[in-house]
Amino acid sequence: ESAPRVATIIPTWQEEEHIERCLRSLMLQSYPATAHQILVIDGGSTDSTVEIVDRLAKESRELDGPEIILLENPARFVPHARNLALEYLQPDTEYILEMIGHAWVPADHIQIRVERMQKIEGEIGRKIGGLGSIVIESDLPLQKVGKWIEATLSCPLGGSGQFARFKKEGPTKTP
């Protein structure tokens, strides 16, 4: 039985310091490369983000790694990037992961996400809409924007860290 097709969507803007680590972590997944497509949707970076993505897309092709596609997002914002990515998905895509260009994942990340999704779907007898994962603190210093995001998510208007409340595996109701 072949592995379900997975697409990883990565909206980017000015990610030259992080995008290589992000993409390499996806290129080195234990999940079959033939069943994994990576869509990087760039919002007009003026640093070397686009050049790094182009270089890694070529490298991944040469190494029979996952397909990496770079798309231009003229609207710049993440919701537009998501919508644009949907137009480029392979028709047999079953699962979509979204990452940020600052993130990287362990080599078994996609394999574990797909297995858990299939397990939960099998238990409840239907497809489900989403699967979260625990965010592990970075080993890099938190930059200004990261500090803003952290402060926003932990304040009452940002949800007071609601995402951290859901720790069990399985279907759950969200507020």
Q: Language-model segments: what does each one mean?
A:
Residues 24-35:
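Short, acidic, metal-binding catalytic loop of nucleotide-sugar glycosyltransferases
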Residues 17-20, 47-56, 108:
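Acidic helix N-cap motif at the loop->helix transition within catalytic regions
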Residues 5-7, 37:
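Cell-envelope/extracellular polymer assembly enzymes that use nucleotide-activated donors
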Residues 160-175:
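A recurrent flexible, glycine/aromatic-enriched loop bordering the glycosyltransferase active site
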Residues 73-89, 112:
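Glycine-rich, basic loop-to-helix element that forms the pyrophosphate-binding segment
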Residues 42-51, 102-104:
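A conserved acidic beta->alpha catalytic loop
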Residues 93-104:
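Short beta-strand-to-loop acidic/aromatic patch adjacent to the donor-nucleotide binding site
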Residues 108-147:
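Conserved donor NDP-sugar-binding/catalytic core segment of glycosyltransferases
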